[in-house]
């Protein structure tokens, strides 16, 4: 089966400041299934992705860790690639936006936009952190909501009342980075004149390049009016400098989608493929992007407009999916449902999740819910109970009674043809991204096979030596029907398909390889292809993921007059200092300990604190706290602890002390 079609497929680029979680995997599994489907059809289908490696969050996290942004993003990229490989997500090339290819393409596109009159310069006012000497993105300013007076709200929207506003509207604004009150400063920024392309975008968005619900949503944005898009950021910033403009950088969202092109460019350079054939304005190839609904605005408006304005082709389609919920709710660290890929892999087989997501994904923008009872039932009933059970039951007889050799003919050609007749419908469902429909059809076929085996009862016939030919024919039929089923499931379960190919002693399975059954063919000894999900492993995964509160014994209240009172002179001996947590990591082998690196302004100290069960390491980094700076160092088996952080506890939890806005590392607490 071959085709003249040529396709390039991408997934949204994971941000390079943290590990993958199950929410990421929805999209990447969805993309991988679609790509595998087309490759099995003989289509040249190239899939590329990479890490989104620029921006303020990466710059600040690297600073907190005491490493360069390049070192941080390189480490995270390795983690992402390792997780993708474990889940059998097989990109033809996986790159990074911090690459020579991306810088060259971003510069080319910017210069073309500038030459075409699409870049506008405007002076804007924004918050500036006088301590860090940097302009602050919206999410790095917090304060009191101007609408409902809720405290500790971000600079772009209130999580209590839902209001949106400018950071300068906040009451008592504070820099999240330094804790000081920011000041307003002017800066000249570069804008892409998106409204110039409103008619082009209206036409493009209504020509079948998007799902209907996405097109309808975009209509609302058109009615509200498109706005010029700020594509520049001020130094300090981790990204690409704007050519010829001192201290100005391309905004991460300008070069991030260009990263698709850069990853493909690297692929082309290494394999001798024509980049222009796929990206030229007159290209006859197909270009598909898979994205989440939270970034539709960038991919369905900015991206096609920017491509068209700079002389490149626009996407054939942008396919949008919904969010992942767990047990009907948003993923939550406190409930243990914010599950990283590596936590899942420590307890469960990756193809359980590939199958479950496939069974629930369709071509719409619906959210997908991971319900663990449903997860267990689907995997155990469908994969183990229906599909694998067919091979297991039939192979046992073939291996033991017939020297691993199948019989020379099928005994129910009609049933074989019946399963083959589902092929086009299954392929259509996968191509339409309605994987749930494909899975339903495949399981309907599996039911027919199990009914056939149950009706013929080879285990009963095997007791009669005169019936062994019938047993041989029935089990040969079962093995061949299993071969059809595993071919249909191959885009979803590539690891199980490969193991099945080894068991069947066959060439790699393709959509047309099942036209001829395996007859008078020697198979290999059957080995278990998949085992049942154990609920205990799910519970262990949730425990590992959970940000549970530490519980401590409740002490009886003691009257103040009975306490061991100290003098003011004794208290003065304790050197309490404001400290900034620049790094935090759990201590392996210790249930409670977290290793903290604390910045005191003129020095750094290492402290081991018993807060591991109360906080995630990531949420501690960058916070200010209070420490005892002159405590005698204590040698522990994990290292030397050079102080103590202060925390409050009520027997139900533990809470780090945090100073008020304006406090700086090294300040003395009096």
Swiss-Prot record:
It is an enzyme of class 6 (ligase). Pfam families: Anticodon_3, tRNA-synt_1g, tRNA_bind. The keyword Lyase does not apply. Zn(2+) binds at residues 145, 148, 158, 161. Its cofactor is Zn(2+). Its main location: cytoplasm. GO terms for cellular component: cytosol. CDD domains: Anticodon_Ia_Met (cd07957), MetRS_core (cd00814), tRNA_bind_EcMetRS_like (cd02800). A motif ('KMSKS' region) lies at residues 330-334. It is found in: Cytoplasm. Homodimer. This is Methionine--tRNA ligase. It comes from Legionella pneumophila subsp. pneumophila (strain Philadelphia 1 / ATCC 33152 / DSM 7513).
């Amino acid at each position: 089966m071959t085709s003249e079609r040529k396709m390039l497929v991408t997934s949204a680029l994971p941000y390079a400041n943290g590990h993958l979680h199950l929410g990421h995997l929805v999209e990447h599994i969805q993309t991988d299934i679609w790509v595998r489907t087309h490759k099995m059809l003989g289509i040249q289908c190239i899939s590329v992705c990479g890490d989104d490696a620029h921006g303020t969050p990466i710059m600040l996290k690297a600073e907190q860790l005491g490493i360069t942004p390049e070192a941080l993003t390189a480490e995270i990229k390795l983690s992402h690639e390792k997780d993708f490989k474990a889940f059998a997500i097989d990109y033809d090339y996986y790159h990074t936006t911090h690459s020579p290819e991306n810088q060259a393409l971003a510069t080319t596109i910017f210069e073309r936009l500038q030459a075409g009159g699409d870049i506008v310069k405007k002076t804007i006012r924004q918050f500036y952190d006088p301590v860090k000497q940097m302009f602050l993105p919206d999410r790095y300013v917090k304060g009191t909501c101007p609408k409902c007076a809720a405290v500790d709200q971000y600079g772009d929207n209130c999580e209590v009342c839902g209001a949106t506003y400018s950071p300068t509207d906040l009451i008592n604004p504070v820099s999240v980075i330094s804790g000081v009150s920011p000041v307003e400063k002017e800066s000249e920024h570069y804008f892409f004149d998106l409204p110039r392309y409103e008619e082009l975008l209206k036409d493009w968005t209504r020509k079948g390049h998007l799902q209907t619900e996405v097109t309808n949503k975009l209509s609302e944005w058109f009615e509200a009016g498109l706005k010029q898009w700020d594509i520049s950021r001020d130094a300090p910033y981790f990204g690409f400098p704007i050519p010829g403009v001192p201290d100005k950088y391309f905004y991460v969202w300008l070069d991030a989608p260009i990263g698709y092109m850069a990853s493909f460019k690297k692929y082309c350079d290494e394999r001798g493929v024509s980049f222009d054939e796929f990206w030229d304005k007159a290209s006859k190839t197909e270009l598909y992007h898979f994205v989440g609904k939270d970034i539709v605005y960038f991919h369905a408006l900015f991206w096609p407009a920017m491509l068209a304005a700079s002389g490149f082709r626009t996407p054939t389609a942008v396919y949008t999916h919904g969010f992942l919920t767990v047990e009907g709710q948003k993923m939550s660290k406190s409930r243990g449902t914010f599950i990283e890929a590596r936590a899942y892999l420590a307890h469960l087989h990756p193809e359980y999740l590939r199958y479950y997501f496939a069974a629930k994904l369709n071509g719409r923008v619906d959210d997908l819910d991971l319900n663990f009872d449903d997860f267990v039932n689907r995997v155990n009933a469908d994969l183990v109970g229906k599909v694998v059970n067919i091979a297991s039951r039939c192979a046992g007889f073939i291996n033991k009674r017939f020297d691993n050799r199948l019989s020379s003919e099928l005994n129910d050609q009609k049933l074989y043809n019946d399963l083959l007749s589902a092929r086009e419908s299954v392929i259509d469902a996968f191509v339409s991204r309605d994987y749930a429909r494909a899975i339903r059809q495949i399981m309907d076929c599996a039911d027919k096979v199990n009914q056939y085996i149950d009706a013929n009862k080879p285990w009963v016939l095997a007791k009669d030596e005169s019936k062994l030919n019938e047993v041989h024919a029935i089990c040969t039929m079962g093995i061949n029907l299993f071969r059809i089923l595993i071919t249909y499931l191959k885009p979803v379960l590539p690891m199980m398909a490969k193991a099945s190919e080894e068991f069947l002693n066959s060439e790699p399975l393709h959509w047309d390889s099942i036209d001829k059954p395996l007859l008078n063919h020697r198979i290999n000894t059957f080995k278990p292809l998949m085992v049942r999900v154990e609920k205990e492993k799910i519970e262990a995964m949730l425990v590992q993921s959970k940000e549970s509160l530490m519980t401590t014994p409740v002490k009886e209240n003691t009257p103040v007059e009975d306490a061991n009172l100290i003098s003011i002179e004794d208290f003065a001996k304790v050197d309490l200092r404001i400290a900034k947590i620049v790094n935090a990591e759990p201590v392996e082998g210790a249930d409670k300990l977290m290793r903290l690196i604390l910045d005191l302004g003129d020095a750094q100290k290492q402290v081991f604190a018993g807060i591991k069960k109360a906080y995630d390491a990531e949420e501690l980094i960058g916070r200010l706290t209070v420490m005892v700076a002159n405590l005698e160092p204590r040698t522990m088996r994990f290292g030397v602890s050079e102080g103590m952080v202060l925390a409050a506890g009520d027997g139900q939890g533990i809470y780090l002390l945090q100073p008020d806005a304006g406090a700086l590392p090294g300040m003395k607490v009096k």
